[in-house]
Amino acid sequence: GINMGLGEIDGENAYMGGLKIAYVANQQFEVGFASNFLYSEQDIYNNSLSRYEDLIAVYGGLHLEPILFSKNRVNLSFPLLLGAGAVGYVDNKFRHDDDFEEELTEDDFDAVFVAEPGVNALFNISRYLQIEAGVKYRFSSKIDLPPTRITRINGFTAGIGIKVGIFNMGRNRYKKNVQ
């Protein structure tokens, strides 16, 4: 699946995109791997570099999602992502200058652990296509990056996504019709 979302970190807009690969067990529980990319227009001034910076984060990990009402066209699910990643700042000049290239080092990033529970409505469009819409809350470990007023990337994200796969929608592919 692929998803995108809009949220907020420290009062500023945050944009998120994600990918996930999962196995759906008995149409009731999804288990797999998910990864997310987050960008937030923070415009934090860095005195040592004399520039304004924005926040970026990349994290991924174990994806668990119990699914209720799995035999219906509309399902309710409770996704949970448990994982780790990196958070850092980048010069916001790249938004305005196509020729700008920034050299990033390991000092520009800090490790972060993330737990991201949520609630989704899943819409079965066809046997191979599902659309999801929902809300998640991101809990993170503390980060320590200069120049920061942000110590965590906690926050709500509302998003939509699309899942492609084989969704049986209540059909048993192994059951034979006997006449």
Describe each region flagged by the PLM.
Residues 2, 21, 31-33, 64, ...:
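Membrane-embedded beta-strand positions of outer-membrane beta-barrel proteins
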Residues 122-179:
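Predominantly the C-terminal beta-signal and adjacent terminal strand-loop region
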Residues 12-14, 43-48, 88-97, 143-150, ...:
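Outer-membrane beta-barrel translocator domains and adjoining extracellular loop/strand segments
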